[in-house]
Swiss-Prot record:
Expressed mainly in floral buds. Detected in roots, leaves, stems, siliques and pollen tubes. The lineage of its organism: Eukaryota, Viridiplantae, Streptophyta, Embryophyta, Tracheophyta. It comes from Arabidopsis thaliana (Mouse-ear cress). Its EC number is 2.4.1.46. Belongs to the glycosyltransferase 28 family. The gene is MGD2. This is Monogalactosyldiacylglycerol synthase 2, chloroplastic.
Amino acid sequence: MATTVMALAEKVLERVYGTSKSAVSVTSGDGEKTHRHTHHHIHRIKSYDDIDEDESSLELIQIGAERTKNVLILMSDTGGGHRASAEAIRDAFKIEFGDKYRVIVKDVWKEYTGWPLNDMERSYKFMVKHVQLWKVAFHSTSPKWIHSCYLAAIAAYYAKEVEAGLMEYKPEIIISVHPLMQHIPLWVLKWQELQKRVLFVTVITDLNTCHPTWFHPGVNRCYCPSQEVAKRALFDGLDESQVRVFGLPVRPSFARAVLVKDDLRKELEMDQDLRAVLLMGGGEGMGPVKETAKALEEFLYDKENRKPIGQMVVICGRNKKLASALEAIDWKIPVKVRGFETQMEKWMGACDCIITKAGPGTIAESLIRSLPIILNDYIPGQEKGNVPYVVENGAGVFTRSPKETARIVGEWFSTKTDELEQTSDNARKLAQPEAVFDIVKDIDELSEQRGPLASVSYNLTSSFASLV
């Protein structure tokens, strides 16, 4: 099937580009797109400001031990996890290797292509707000023959634009942290005859149930966050030599932070003696945050002795309306209401458990902080498998009920403290704080094994159809 799809992709390209190897006019004087009239109009990139128009190809300078190597990380803001992972990898490269690598994080689709690739962020946000729509989209595109044909058609239409994106950054190493950024860049590398010269790796950012588009047999390495994902990679045709299981990349400032709970609580002006629960509303402050907060107040207040048995921190994200509503309440227990936070390692370090939806990044960070997790929701498809990943490993529980959530926290803070401690210990054992460093070290080893390359040429006039 894969061979058939590849042949289909190349036949489509032949129809679009033809077999001529003549040079292509790329821009008009005012920078607007130009079109070459063949059987179809061919959309071109907006400008090549950084390209010498007198040259038909671009040559990278000599690559040697003393030369900084370019690393291009492909991502998209479809959910916050992809950018967070990309930036974590970038920071880890800097910490481990200094100026040996120049790492660029880019959404090439958004910057270089047209619809639907340049509109994925808005489309994704719309669909996850209508979860049944997203569920249908996720599962209907899972069969290989469907997503391969879809991606082949897009590749045929936007190949030159993607090629231009790669030419601008001239990477020796490409890292994909998004499921839709394997097939098309790899096809472009094949058409440019660069697959054996440009290192291409995938870093999967879903903990369990990930979309099949994550897996492409043409990658040099596929970094999986769990054994469950590694099994899926092997099932989808990757070889064991291509697969590594290191964990989910978490930003180094979080993973290696040395934090003392008492000091954090003093800094954050929290009660020093009461156990604390962290209630997450995500970046957009979505979900039953207010209902859960009110339920927690009831279960964390000892009516008989008229005193609190716990305190609460609520992260409202960008939802200012929610933050204002919570701040207006006269709480019976200590409550901290926060907006969009950039220092989550401190708030996590100051708390004793967390309530959140099943986003992989938040789960990975919670495990590093040894926080027992109460999962209260998940996005169908890629987040569904995160629930058994947490629950079956004893690192937390799942319930959508605000009242049940509050009851569990109330028991953890009063009659079931041993269970709280055991769950915390299980979370710590499941954590992989060094994952991002293991990933960049392995990429560096792969790069060194290849040795210095004479040159890497991104040819502006190559005929993609010539491989048919």
